Amino acid sequence: MFEIHPVKKVSVVIPVYNEQESLPELIRRTTTACESLGKEYEILLIDDGSSDNSAHMLVEASQAENSHIVSILINRNYGQHSAIMAGFSHVTGDLIITLDADLQNPPEEIPRLVAKADEGYDVVGTVRQNRQDSWFRKTASKMINRLIQRTTGKAMGDYGCMLRAYRRHIVDAMLHCHERSTFIPILANIFARRAIEIPVHHAEREFGESKYSFMRLINLMYDLVTCLTTTPLRMLSLLGSIIAIGGFSIAVLLVILRLTFGPQWAAEGVFMLFAVLFTFIGAQFIGMGLLGEYIGRIYTDVRARPRYFVQQVIRPSSKENE
């Protein structure tokens, strides 16, 4: 049996990107939720290259009296998961909770995650109840969840919800992974011995708009497919074999029909030829695009550039910058 260590200090990691309207409420509610734990805590807010006043507000929050806010300023926008990894590299707690800054996942759920982690779980995921998102967002999320479940074999219900708790050894394991395309909930489940999901409330977004546009969701889908499995490459080989066999069969059939009915049959086969040709060309472009995605990610990994560049860290204990 593995010894279950009680949680002594909680670190809350929150990526921030142009969230100046929600920041005061976010900090207030998150601080209140952490105070109710009766444990040591810290709140790490990572500014992911915001163009509004978010970074300045984070610095002020860290420098306030009796603050528990650690502000991490990144030089530009690297994306949600890279920003969270930047936060992971500066945590000091033995339980790390991730949370979005838009307040759609209430910070008041934090004590429930801590209590569940205290039961001995390595990862505590969440499932959003009565999601307050658009039909498009909910449909895209369902498709992504099904893709992940089939690829990884992990029957988690809501990979898109970032309100999650991770034991310190899980976070340390993730920090030792150096691939550029990182999807944290999946990566954490690879290392977790015991994982569980609990239902949580989901609220409407009060401030601003979602940072996940249509194209960002498409990029996320490509990231998930190419960083999880090489199955699409195997499927391309299978598809190529099927197309080759089909093309040969059609060619034989066309020869037989031409010999049987003469050259006038089906406009001398011109239309059929074009149909087959366009089918093959379309399949080739799909395959080339998918191969390009894999090769592009290999190229990115080979360059070994950092996932992010932390420009400044402001801790509450001192106003000096790291």
UniProtKB/Swiss-Prot annotation:
Residues 257-269 are periplasmic. The chain crosses the membrane at residues 236-256, 270-290. The keyword Membrane applies. It is found in: Cell inner membrane. Signal peptide: none annotated. Keywords: Antibiotic resistance, Cell inner membrane, Cell membrane, Glycosyltransferase, Lipid A biosynthesis, Lipid biosynthesis, Lipid metabolism, Lipopolysaccharide biosynthesis, Membrane, Transferase, Transmembrane, Transmembrane helix. Its EC number is 2.4.2.53. Catalyzes the transfer of 4-deoxy-4-formamido-L-arabinose from UDP to undecaprenyl phosphate. The modified arabinose is attached to lipid A and is required for resistance to polymyxin and cationic antimicrobial peptides. HAMAP family: ArnC_transfer (MF_01164). Belongs to the glycosyltransferase 2 family. This is Undecaprenyl-phosphate 4-deoxy-4-formamido-L-arabinose transferase. The gene is arnC.
